[in-house]
């Protein structure tokens, strides 16, 4: 590991201060890199006023959105520990995990809070709404002292020296994250993740899958999962990509429209999503008898499969360079469509822009 991933984020924020970093697709919320820096600075001030120390736990339970990643960045760079919780967990499980993790603060979305508000959460010093960073609850002693912090005018500007980490370097072997998964037995389990682990994965991504600043990503995977957190946030943001977050369930119609609008360079997903797109866009074509025969005819098979592959790439916006797909085995037919086994010279000669 050469650098902590926050080092790369610092460089991106400095170099792309006025450029868009995060967007809630189809909604009005978006952040420039400079606005991310300003909001992180507000959060750090808030944490100090709440008496939150380095190593204290702060839980996040919400849908994917730009505010989620801003809050996460603030927590990690403050040297507190982020506790990421899936919004689909049952309210009683969420309450138990918040207590189990010894979290002192909760940042929660309205969908989650609708049921969670009926649970006892006595250990929390503050509960904040993910939608607008307003307070839902403050423990006695803090009321009247901190409500103004998240709306204060920022003194940071493009020419101001800024670093996400303000108080010395981070111990890379210290705890950064507790990630609660659904668990193979149906009972959520916590995985403890260090700063070193996150940074190694980010650096591997930057090395293996190079990104040009300003390239776009559509995020459809849950940010509370490690796959989505790394592929749809930490790695592309560290490289200067602009990330569009789907705030609704990624149905084929929503996803296809987002892909056509955004034209991402990278798609991180699970096999089921690609198979649904394949079924929606290509099954009507491939169900024709003549194509069924051609599919297994050596002389024309590669031509047909290349056409199908290009159609799939076009369905994902036409600019996709990388598919990251994990979590389960992919349908072999779909996989063969995506794998391009032609030589580099053949690809240059035969392919046209989608």
How does the language model describe each region?
Residues 1-21, 38, 176:
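A short N-terminal helical cap/helix-turn-helix that marks the beginning
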Residues 18, 129, 147-180, 187, ...:
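Conserved pre-ATP/AMP-binding loop-to-beta segment of ANL
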Residues 21-65, 69-73, 90-95, 195:
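Conserved AMP-binding/adenylate-forming core of the ANL superfamily
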Residues 32-34, 176-202:
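Conserved AMP-binding A3 loop
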Residues 57, 63-83, 87-91, 99-105, ...:
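A short helix-loop-beta submotif of the ANL/AMP-binding
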Residues 77-153:
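Structural core segment of the AMP-binding/adenylate-forming
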Residues 87-121, 201-218, 251-265:
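Conserved ATP-dependent adenylate/AMP-binding module captured primarily in the ANL superfamily
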Residues 199-216, 223-311, 319, 341:
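Conserved AMP-binding/adenylation subdomain of ANL enzymes
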